[in-house]
């Protein structure tokens, strides 16, 4: 820069330099010029110009000069100083528009919290509006302390290129370029916007009518005001977007502008509604944050408001579907949300930083900056709606529910003695009400040991009914503390926390071998119908004192023992029965204790006797026959059981189950039309050597290294499963770019389409049979080795064949789905069927599938869509954080209602297993109570 200034000073003015050399001014005059000019330049520029002046003065001649020469020098020096000031001004203006410096300044403002209010006061209102508008354009956030001022405008880019470049047009450019096709904007201008002025007056009246403690009521009234002004509520935001597109075109044609005052927008999309709500909230001093981006809304161009209640918790405000509904924001803490600005050329939404290691507060401690984990725990400790005699919790509609502070937990004695229904209230006594959908809050006490209506209590003989705590078994031989992790549990009255879990192991996987081995010896040997699971007793077993006996015939009086840990108090009983059973089973085998050959003979004989039920050549495998038969699995040697880790890493096992045996060349498949789009790929109808098949091709073909090995490992697992209620796996294409799995083709399609098509009338007994099919298919997955957790069980993944048999599909690929619902910044996913722990991204086991089955049973019983009228974001908040459940209709059979509620237990360990569900569903003969005549 110094050389440029010298060039400006010397270039084209050689005569001035000559005159300066001939006759320089006195040194005192030189000093006057130097001291007079620094206010026009920066300190750095002054230091740079001083040597030049010094050099000029040193070159001056001590001889006196004429007045004309002195005047020429003064004019040339003044010209130089003007040029210097212009250069410095241009340099400063360029640096102020530097995007990097602007980002650094914005980051400093955001991190300080106060946003330098003193500097903002010095700026004019136009400068503040321009700064806030640019901040919202680039970073997508206006914080609680930032008020929307007049001349603030929100620009919507219709051109993706401009958005990527971070080019934000000024308000003057938008107003001068009439009808600019690349942008449209809404502006806040109270003096000229009469509609906005009226809305502000209404908001002031609403605030005066609400007490200072009724913040949720104020939020609801403001949300209803915004929604009513901008076209009303809508279940589908795409419909509102289409209406706005049409309306904006009319505005542009009539007004010849692309800038619309916010008050004149009568059909508003989410960004318009959120901005108007922010303006109204600022006017009534309601803390409100305006956030734009896909983190909350699923769309980069949508916006949402978050409000902070007096307990320092943040909630999202619904302004589209159900105005005024508050949904807890998925921040780890209200105070630990560090908003960092992102690159303006990339994602414009600031990233929220979480900490997964937030220390959990003990009871008695409190903080306004508590973590979401503590918030979830407080929800779990909250008193839920009390249970009535009909076992249905009848809770009033949820609307203004306050989740700010947990109330004391009601004892189980009070819950039992109270036969009336308590209407749920918030901490401030507001009655819970809702105008759209009635949801039930699952009472934690409904399955307590003292509850006589516990449907599954008799199925668990190892439950200590008289104790406050259940026996917690320990695993012998597992001494490495680092390999354990504590499962997150809800503190419940009268219940102990869940047992420790082995990493990468399902909850019932490790002790399953020993427990089922004991149970098999405790109960008589059962011949099971391989299709329907019917049991017939081959012989009865009794103890020496006659305490235990069993005689099971068909479906009647079936007692099924859940696979729970065996207390040490039963060790003597186990040893008591084992010798007699072993002797009876091996009386023809020369007293050899080899159980598996005998079991194989029994199965072989059963297959020969019952081959008319279904084709065993299709559903059985000679090389691996333990995939779904619990008898074979229970009698396996303990040393032969493999967990998921050892199964993947043992080379010998991998060689025995080579993927090459089920490899299908891509060229052998004749691909036809596409019949579906799943959560991980496209589904095609294809032909494979004359056989109709379904080909599921992955959308993400970038599989290499560990991911490809994981895919092949899942193929081995699916290859082993043979069950009439599991989609038959034929093979796989294991070579990119055509990674696919090939299964049987089921022409009737998904159960979802059958249940929810118009005028669908399915016989009630057929629907019961469908529920039983799903339970038996899932029991096959959960009892396999290793245990297969579906994690995406829903009616769209249940397929129906020509004989109306329901089969479980899309299993075994949960680990290949890289994004869960919360980790993915899109609305992809189906939270309507997901368990609360899955929606919260907490560790989950196979019991999450049991919750999903409860939703499926609810669908089969009611023939209604789950959570109809709510968008996915609302379902996540309702189920995952507010502990809400679907309403159980009064016309449902009480047994069916209790089964569904048992599946929806908040604590996964309290949910029944699919083995228990199968036994309970078998004698079921109705879903709905008969209509009184």
Swiss-Prot record:
Any GO MF annotation of the entry: protein serine kinase activity
Biased composition (Low complexity): 53-68, 367-378, 404-413
Active site: 792
Superkingdom of this protein's organism: Eukaryota
Effect of disrupting the coding gene: Hypersensitivity to abscisic acid (ABA). Confers defense priming against pathogens and stresses such as E.cichoracearum, H.parasitica and P.syringae pv. tomato DC3000. This enhanced resistance is associated with a faster induction of several defense responses, including callose deposition and host cell death, in a salicylic acid- (SA-) dependent manner, as well as a strong elicitation of stress-induced MPK3 and MPK6 activity. Enhanced stress responses and spontaneous necrotic lesions under drought conditions.
Residue intervals of the Protein kinase domain: 669-925
Bias kind Basic and acidic residues: ranges: 379-389, 607-621
Biased composition (Basic residues): 1-10
Start-end of Polar residues biased regions: 37-48, 342-356, 533-550
Binding site for ATP: 675-683, 696
Gene3D superfamilies from the UniProt entry: Phosphorylase Kinase, domain 1, Transferase(Phosphotransferase) domain 1
Catalytic reaction list: L-seryl-[protein] + ATP = O-phospho-L-seryl-[protein] + ADP + H(+); L-threonyl-[protein] + ATP = O-phospho-L-threonyl-[protein] + ADP + H(+)
SMART domains referenced in this protein's UniProt entry, alphabetically: S_TKc (SM00220)
Keyword Nucleotide-binding: yes
Region (Disordered) residue spans: 1-74, 342-424, 527-550, 604-650
Induction statement: Accumulates at the penetration site of powdery mildew (e.g. G.cichoracearum) infection.
Single GO BP term: response to bacterium
Enzyme class, broadest EC rank: transferase
Pfam families: EDR1_CTR1_ARMC3_pept, PK_Tyr_Ser-Thr
Keywords for the protein's UniProt record, in alphabetical order: Abscisic acid signaling pathway, ATP-binding, Cell membrane, Endoplasmic reticulum, Endosome, Ethylene signaling pathway, Golgi apparatus, Kinase, Membrane, Nucleotide-binding, Nucleus, Phosphoprotein, Plant defense, Serine/threonine-protein kinase, Transferase
Record's GO cellular component terms: cytosol; early endosome; endoplasmic reticulum; endosome; nucleus; plasma membrane; trans-Golgi network; trans-Golgi network transport vesicle membrane
Family designation: Belongs to the protein kinase superfamily. TKL Ser/Thr protein kinase family. RAF subfamily.
Described function: MAPKKK serine/threonine-protein kinase involved in the regulation of a MAP kinase cascade (probably including MPK3 and MPK6) that negatively regulates salicylic acid- (SA-) dependent defense responses, abscisic acid (ABA) signaling, and ethylene-induced senescence. Also modulates stress response (e.g. drought) signaling and cell death, in an ORE9-dependent manner. Functions at a point of cross talk between ethylene, ABA and SA signaling that impinges on senescence and cell death.
Quaternary data: Interacts with KEG. Binds and recruited by EDR4 at the powdery mildew (e.g. G.cichoracearum) penetration site on the plasma membrane.
PANTHER family: SERINE-THREONINE PROTEIN KINASE (PTHR23257), SERINE_THREONINE-PROTEIN KINASE EDR1 (PTHR23257:SF813)
Protein's UniProt name: Serine/threonine-protein kinase EDR1
Organism: Arabidopsis thaliana
């Amino acid at each position: 820069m110094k050389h440029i200034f010298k060039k400006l000073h010397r270039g084209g003015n050689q005569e001035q330099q000559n005159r300066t050399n001939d006759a320089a001014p006195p040194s005192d005059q030189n000093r006057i010029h130097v001291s007079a000019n620094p206010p026009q330049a920066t300190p750095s520029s002054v230091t740079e110009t001083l040597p030049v002046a010094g050099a000029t003065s040193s070159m001056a001649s001590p001889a006196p000069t004429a007045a004309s020469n002195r005047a020429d020098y003064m004019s040339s020096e003044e010209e130089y100083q003007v040029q210097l000031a212009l250069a410095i001004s241009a340099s400063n203006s360029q640096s102020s528009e530097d995007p990097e410096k602007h980002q650094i300044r914005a980051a400093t403002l955001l991190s300080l919290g106060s946003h330098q209010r003193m500097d903002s006061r010095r700026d004019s209102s136009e400068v503040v509006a321009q700064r806030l508008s640019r901040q919202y354009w680039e970073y997508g956030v206006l914080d609680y302390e930032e008020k929307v001022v007049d001349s603030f405008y929100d620009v919507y880019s219709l051109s993706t290129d401009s958005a990527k470049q971070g080019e934000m047009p000024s308000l003057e450019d938008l107003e001068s370029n009439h009808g600019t096709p690349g942008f449209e904007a809404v502006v806040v201008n109270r003096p000229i916007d009469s509609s906005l002025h009226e809305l502000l007056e209404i908001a002031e009246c609403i605030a005066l009518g609400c007490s200072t403690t009724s913040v949720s009521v104020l939020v609801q009234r403001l949300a209803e005001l915004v929604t009513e002004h901008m076209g009303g509520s809508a279940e589908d935001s795409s419909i509102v977007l289409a209406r706005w597109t049409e309306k904006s075109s009319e505005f542009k044609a009539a007004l010849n502008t692309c800038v619309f005052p916010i008050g004149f927008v009568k059909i508003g999309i989410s960004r318009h509604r959120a901005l108007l709500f922010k303006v109204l909230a600022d006017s009534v001093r309601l803390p409100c944050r305006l956030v734009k981006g896909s983190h909350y809304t699923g769309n980069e161009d949508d916006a949402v408001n978050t409000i902070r209640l007096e307990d320092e918790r943040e909630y999202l405000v619904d302004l589209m579907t159900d105005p005024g509904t508050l949904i807890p924001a998925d921040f780890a803490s209200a105070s630990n949300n560090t908003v960092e600005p992102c690159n303006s050329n990339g994602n414009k939404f600031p990233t929220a930083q979480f900490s997964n290691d937030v220390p959990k507060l003990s009871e008695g401690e409190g903080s306004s900056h508590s973590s979401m984990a503590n918030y979830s725990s407080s929800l779990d400790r909250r008193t839920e709606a009390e249970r009535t005699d009909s076992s249905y919790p009848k809770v009033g509609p949820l609307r203004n529910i306050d989740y700010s502070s947990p109330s004391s937990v009601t004892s189980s004695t009070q819950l039992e003695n109270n036969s009336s229904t308590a209407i749920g209230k918030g901490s401030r006594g507001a009655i819970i009400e809702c105008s759209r959908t009635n949801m039930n809050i699952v009472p934690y006490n409904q399955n307590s040991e003292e509850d006589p209506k516990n449907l599954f209590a008799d199925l668990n003989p190892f439950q200590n009914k008289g104790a406050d705590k259940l026996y917690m078994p320990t695993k012998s031989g597992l001494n490495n503390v680092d390999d354990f992790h504590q499962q997150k549990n809800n503190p419940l009255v009268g219940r102990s926390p869940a047992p420790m879990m082995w990493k990468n192991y399902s909850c019932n996987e490790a002790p399953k071998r020993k427990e089922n081995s004991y149970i098999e010896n405790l109960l008589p040997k059962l011949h099971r119908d391989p299709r329907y699971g019917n049991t017939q007793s081959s012989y009865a077993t009794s103890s020496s004192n006659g305490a235990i006996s069993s005689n099971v015939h068909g479906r009647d009086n079936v007692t099924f023992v859940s696979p729970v840990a065996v207390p040490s108090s039963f060790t003597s009983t186990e040893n008591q029965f084992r010798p007699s059973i072993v002797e009876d089973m091996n009386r023809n085998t020369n007293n050899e204790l080899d159980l598996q050959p005998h079991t194989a003979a029994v199965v072989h004989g059963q297959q020969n006797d019952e081959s008319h039920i279904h084709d065993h050549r299709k559903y059985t495998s000679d090389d691996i026959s333990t995939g779904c038969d619990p008898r074979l699995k229970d009698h396996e040697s303990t040393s032969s059981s493999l967990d998921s880790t050892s199964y993947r890493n043992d080379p010998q096992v991998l060689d025995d189950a080579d993927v090459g045996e089920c490899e299908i060349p891509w060229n052998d498949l004749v691909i036809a039309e596409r019949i579906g789009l799943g959560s991980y790929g496209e589904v095609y109808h294809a032909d494979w050597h004359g056989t109709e098949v379904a080909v599921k091709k992955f959308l993400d073909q970038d599989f290499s290294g560990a991911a490809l090995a994981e895919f092949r490992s899942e193929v081995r697992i699916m290859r082993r499963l043979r069950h009439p209620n599991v989609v038959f796996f034929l093979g796989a294409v294991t070579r990119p770019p055509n990674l696919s799995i090939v299964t049987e083709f089921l022409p009737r399609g998904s159960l979802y389409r059958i249940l929810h098509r118009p005028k669908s009338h399915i016989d009630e007994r057929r629907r019961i049979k469908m529920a039983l099919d799903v339970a038996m298919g899932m029991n096959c997955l959960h009892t396999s080795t290793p245990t297969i957790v579906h994690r995406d069980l829903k009616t769209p993944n249940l397929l129906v064949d020509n004989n109306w048999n329901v089969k479980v599909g899309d299993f075994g690929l949960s680990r290949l789905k890289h994004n869960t619902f919360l980790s993915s910044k899109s609305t992809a996913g189906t939270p309507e069927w997901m368990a609360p722990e899955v929606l919260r991204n907490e560790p989950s086991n196979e019991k999450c599938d049991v919750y999903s089955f409860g939703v499926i049973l609810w669908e089969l019983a009611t023939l209604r869509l789950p959570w109809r009228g709510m968008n996915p974001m609302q379902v996540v908040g309702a189920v995952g954080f507010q502990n809400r459940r679907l309403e159980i209709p009064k016309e449902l059979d009480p047994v069916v209602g209790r089964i569904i509620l048992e599946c929806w237990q908040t604590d996964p360990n309290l949910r029944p297993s699919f083995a228990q569900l199968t036994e309970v569903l078998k004698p079921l003969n109705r879903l709905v109570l008969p209509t009184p005549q």
